[in-house]
A protein has these predicted regions:
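Helix-to-loop junction immediately C-terminal to a conserved catalytic motif
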Residues: 62
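Conserved ABC transporter NBD signature motif
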Residues: 70-82
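Hydrophobic anchor residue at the start of the ABC signature
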Residues: 153
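Catalytic Walker B motif of ABC-type/P-loop ATPase nucleotide-binding domains
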Residues: 164-167
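Conserved signature/switch motifs of ABC ATPase nucleotide-binding domains
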Residues: 138-141, 159
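Conserved ABC ATPase "signature" region
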Residues: 106, 110, 117-135, 187
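The feature captures the beta-strand-to-loop junction immediately N-terminal to the Walker
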Residues: 47-49
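Short coil-to-helix segment of the ABC ATPase nucleotide-binding domain corresponding to the Q-loop/switch region
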Residues: 99-107
Length: 256
């Protein structure tokens, strides 16, 4: 895959990245020579079979793990651990149970130089963005799974990152809530100038949300594949081109 040398805010470049673990004393390679350029403001979905290294790649991008070889660049600078320009959203939002919605979102913003009033003002903006302005005073125990995940998204956006990294954020939700949240994410990503990298096992979700899909191989020596999703937004799951992309992915995974 070609790699552009010029970068803008939120651009990610991965060069010759490999990562392995030791399983019972034997090296197990999960990522092999990954090369990729993610454009500023792009939405990239990462899919693959279990064990293909999806979450591992996201954790390396987040700075939560080191690669064995290769490098990750954000805006042309090498990633060395976690950074304020990257925010991570996990499947479980991990809200602080003793804080209400507004305080969960504003938590930590004051340490970034904002006054308490500024921090709460910014938090209110993002709580409204995810549609929870009527629940600012609610506590996590009072929220549904979808509402809690919205709080997690608002909290991540409140730090105003250049890059949003999402590890199966909707995986624990029921089918109807998941569809609603996918629509919300598509709207938020349209309104916010942020690069998004999403790990998902849901192929339809990847097509609905992403500009491009990176398919990681499970087999040793396999090559990653990139698929362009050139569809208008908002996307119609019943549209012929959407269905064609779904069939293409199902065929690639041997599910059709």
């Amino acid at each position: 895959m070609s790699i552009a040398e010029d970068t803008r805010r939120g651009e990610v470049t991965i060069r010759h990245l490999s990562k392995s673990y030791r399983l019972n004393g034997t090296p197990l390679q999960v990522l092999r020579d990954i090369n990729l350029h993610v454009r500023s403001g792009e939405s990239l979905a990462i899919v693959g079979a279990s064990g293909s290294g999806k979450t591992t790649l996201l954790r390396v991008l987040a700075g939560l793990e080191d690669s064995d070889t290769g490098e990750v660049l954000v805006d042309g600078k090498a990633v060395r651990g976690v950074g304020a320009e990257r925010a991570v959203i996990f499947q479980e939002p991990r809200l602080l149970p003793w804080l209400d919605v507004l305080d969960n979102v504003s938590f930590g913003l004051e340490t970034s130089g904002l006054s308490r009033e500024q921090a709460r003002g910014r938090a209110r903006h993002y709580v409204k963005l995810v549609g929870l302005q009527q629940f600012e005073a609610a506590y996590p125990r009072q929220l549904s799974g979808g509402m809690a995940q919205r709080v997690g998204i608002a909290r991540a956006l409140a730090v105003q990152p250049e890059i949003l990294l999402l590890d199966e954020p909707l995986g624990a939700l029921d089918a109807m809530t998941k569809i609603g949240m996918q629509q919300e994410l598509a709207r938020i990503w349209r309104d916010e100038d942020v690069t998004t990298i999403l790990v998902t096992h849901d192929l339809e979700e990847a097509i609905y949300l992403a500009d491009r899909i990176l398919i990681l191989p499970r087999e040793k020596g396999g090559e990653p594949r990139l698929i362009e999703i050139d569809l208008p937004r908002p996307r119609d799951r019943s549209a012929p081109e959407f269905v064609r992309h779904r069939e293409e992915l199902l065929n690639l995974f041997g599910l059709h």
